[in-house]
Amino acid sequence: MRAPWFPCLVLATLLSHAVLAGVRTLISYRALALGGDAVTVGLVTGAFALLPLVVALHIGRAVDRGGGVLVVRLGLILTVAAVLVAAASPSAGFLIGASAVLGLGQILHTVACQSLIPLWSPPEKVDDRFGQLTLGVSAGQLVGFPVAGSVATLTNAGATTGEQVATTPALLVMAGLAALAVPLAFWFVPAERIRVSRADASAVRQSTLAILGTRGMKPAVYSSLTVLTGMDLLMAYLPLLGQSMGLGVGAVTMLLTARSVASVVSRAAMPLLLRAVPRRVLLVSATLASGAPMALVPLTTDIVLLTVMMLVVGFFWGLGQPLTMSWVTTVADPHNRAAALSVRLAGNRIGQVVVPLAAGGLAGITGAGAIFHAGGLLLLSSALCTLVSTREPPAEPGRVAPSRHGVHPTDVTSRRTRRRPAGR
């Protein structure tokens, strides 16, 4: 018996992001255990984004032609492989390779899931479904951090202060969790199966510059970039900062979990917030209200105050990602929605390559604390850009702008191969 497509996508997303959250923190500890330093952590973190940056737009084109389901499956399989390589990595070089493959698997899965929502959903449900998908992301992080942290804490019970953290058992547990997501991608019933010929796709294809030239696209990409980069810096460098501040694995895990809990709450409350608060206010606050706490993290060792900061940051970050997804799909040409989402993710990856590498160099000179100051400033600059660019409110997700070619993608049927939805 086949299952409905949307619950399967959300559950697969929950599992894959549980793995992603746990593994990326564990990889930082493993890099240190293999003799690395802040620069090594920066290289490992940057590798996660480098390969996806190269292939992001090609993935979007494949999804726009109807290959979304295959892309989801490939992404989940690569995630399992990457975690197994990380668990067995004998050197920083292998760890960098595992991080790159993990990033590729994640962007395959992410682009496909985000693109299938506007393709297979009624317009009035797009906002809610993006919110539910990102709620799955936050719930996954909420699961991933404590699972990885608990296994690592048990594995390292009795270790002396300053001793390197053993990560192999926790990474193997994460690999098992990743494997649970793979069957879900083969189980659901696609809402529809559409194949678009290369000739049809080429006729309506926009270049990257044309996509970025769409009104509202650049600030949406920048807002998403700063939020996701902030998440990356927090996951990658809080362990390093924690070691220098005397915080153990359990304390760091608790802080990251608090951030995830707050994101779950904000995403669960998003339908109510959208009815009560103007969309522009939510978009601006996503980066404005999170910038100051991010910058202040290195200035205290008080665990209660740090937890409050994580709760504030997590709540507002939880709003930013689904709102920018809806913004991008609304302003994008209908034929190029997956490509536009890929451009958004490519922008995220540019930030994930450049910022961690710069942060690693900065940390090597000034210490890990400066990374959090820089991340906070990026968030505040994004808030200013969003405020200026949304003087006219972003369009509602149900109000899709007409295609520059004058036709909606579902109207181009002459050279498409359509099959009836499976199970009907």
Give residue ranges: language-model regions.
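Cytoplasmic helix-loop-helix junction between adjacent transmembrane helices
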Residues: 100-137
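C-terminal membrane-cytosol helix-exit motif in multi-pass small-molecule transporters
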Residues: 175-196, 385-390
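Core transmembrane helices of Major Facilitator Superfamily
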Residues: 20, 101-113, 312-324
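Juxtamembrane intracellular "pre-TM" segments in multi-pass secondary transporters
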Residues: 1-3, 188-221, 403-418
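Helix-loop boundary and gating motifs at the non-cytosolic
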Residues: 2-49, 218-219, 223, 227-241, ...
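Helix-to-loop junctions at the C-terminal end of transmembrane segments
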Residues: 55-67, 266-278
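Helix-breaking motifs and short loop linkers at transmembrane-helix boundaries and internal kinks
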Residues: 35, 67, 88-90, 300-301
